[in-house]
Amino acid sequence: GVPCLCDSDGPNVRGNTLSGTYWLAGCPSGWHNCKSSGPNIGWCCKK
């Protein structure tokens, strides 16, 4: 999957670890949305 920035990673992508994974159709079972203000399309999820 494509890495994405969770709220816990920091305010921006520069210099921060991207601990989330981008899912177009929503988070799979056992994962949760980790970005409160997510992208317009898809979700940023982590296990």
UniProtKB/Swiss-Prot annotation:
Weakly inhibits voltage-gated sodium channels (Nav). GO terms for molecular function: sodium channel regulator activity; toxin activity. Disulfide bonds join 4-44, 6-34, 27-45. One of its GO terms (cellular component) is extracellular region. Belongs to the sea anemone sodium channel inhibitory toxin family. Type I subfamily. GO terms for biological process: regulation of signal transduction. It comes from the Eukaryota. This is Delta-actitoxin-Axm1c. Keywords: Disulfide bond, Ion channel impairing toxin, Nematocyst, Neurotoxin, Secreted, Toxin, Voltage-gated sodium channel impairing toxin. It is found in: Secreted; Nematocyst.
